[in-house]
UniProtKB/Swiss-Prot annotation:
Belongs to the DEFL family. GO terms for molecular function: metal ion binding; metal ion sequestering activity. It is found in: Secreted, Extracellular space. The lineage of its organism: Eukaryota, Viridiplantae, Streptophyta, Embryophyta, Tracheophyta. GO terms for biological process: cellular detoxification of cadmium ion; defense response. Transmembrane segments: none annotated. InterPro entries: Defensin_plant, Scorpion_toxin-like, Scorpion_toxin-like_sf. GO terms for cellular component: extracellular space. This is Defensin-like protein CAL1. Induction: Induced by cadmium in roots. Down-regulated by cold stress. Keywords: Cadmium, Disulfide bond, Metal-binding, Secreted, Signal. Expressed preferentially in root exodermis and xylem parenchyma cells in vasculature of root and flag leaf sheath. Disulfide bonds join 34-80, 45-65, 51-74, 55-76.
């Protein structure tokens, strides 16, 4: 039994839709963050919120506490 034209057309249309949707998906790369140790933060970094506030005074948008050896230091973050 040969496939009908309607069946072949439907299969072709379905295949075309699948190919078109795959072509439309693109992966968005996440922005890289650069870290720089804060020059103004004093003492051990316990709160990333306090670190971020100090980093904002240094013209960075954000900051976080990171382990540096045995001590925790404040590192300021920005998009590279």
């Amino acid at each position: 039994m040969a496939p009908s034209r309607r069946m072949v057309a439907s299969a072709f249309l379905l295949l075309a839709i699948l190919v078109a949707t795959e072509m439309g998906t693109t992966k968005v790369a996440e922005a890289r963050h650069c870290l720089s140790q804060s020059h103004r933060f004093k003492g051990m970094c316990v709160s990333s919120n306090n670190c971020a506030n100090v980093c904002r005074t240094e013209s960075f948008p954000d900051g976080e506490c990171k382990s540096h050896g045995l001590e925790r230091k404040c590192f300021c973050k920005k998009v590279c």
